[in-house]
């Protein structure tokens, strides 16, 4: 059972921010395209609604599917891993589209840093939906404080989510699957709507999900609502 008296989360990032060496086009996407989409702070959100947030978008499949399916919604997509950022940007601008001038979706903002400072800076009750899809599970007990599903982050999300807003979580890791309900049952600001071992309708698939299923791991999908 998780220790709810655990120490506060370290105010630093863990894990890699770069994998394999970037190819020339990937570097151009980071240098020329990313600045065009980068989230510019709370003042840039005036009049923006509905507003969704994805924490750790991985390869970007889910984020792109959501903005295409919901053009009336603005999505802030967070990812620190450079190769994941490049994957998202290349989905938006496949070759030979120009990295500096080709049109980009107007309902997407990208945050290429730790999501927690972004959350702390958001106004109260601004988010309509939050996605946490297959986060790093940090399965060792001594690393539990690094997991995003954590009492401190849940409290921050409770402040910035509107009443009735939904937090969607997915994980294929058994440790995380036990961790999520233990943490969330203690959060009075959230109510469990549903948990399923089948991906619900309206949840775009991701490569991480496909990889888990191929490896014989069964994902779980949670839907929590802000009371």
From Swiss-Prot:
EC number of the protein: 2.1.1.33
PANTHER family to which the protein is assigned, alphabetical: 3-DEOXY-D-MANNO-OCTULOSONIC-ACID TRANSFERASE/TRNA GUANINE-N 7 - -METHYLTRANSFERASE (PTHR23417), PENTACOTRIPEPTIDE-REPEAT REGION OF PRORP DOMAIN-CONTAINING PROTEIN (PTHR23417:SF14)
GO MF terms, alphabetically ordered: tRNA (guanine(46)-N7)-methyltransferase activity
Positions bound to substrate: 140, 172, 206-209
Cellular-component GO terms for this entry: tRNA methyltransferase complex
This protein's UniProt keywords: Methyltransferase, S-adenosyl-L-methionine, Transferase, tRNA processing
Pathway annotation: tRNA modification; N(7)-methylguanine-tRNA biosynthesis
Reaction it catalyzes: guanosine(46) in tRNA + S-adenosyl-L-methionine = N(7)-methylguanosine(46) in tRNA + S-adenosyl-L-homocysteine
General function of this protein: Catalyzes the formation of N(7)-methylguanine at position 46 (m7G46) in tRNA.
Gene: trmB
Record's protein name: tRNA (guanine-N(7)-)-methyltransferase
Family assignment from sequence similarity: Belongs to the class I-like SAM-binding methyltransferase superfamily. TrmB family.
Residues noted as binding S-adenosyl-L-methionine in the record, renumbered to the chain: 54, 79, 114, 136
Protein species of origin: Granulibacter bethesdensis (strain ATCC BAA-1260 / CGDNIH1)
Pfam families the UniProt entry points to: Methyltransf_4
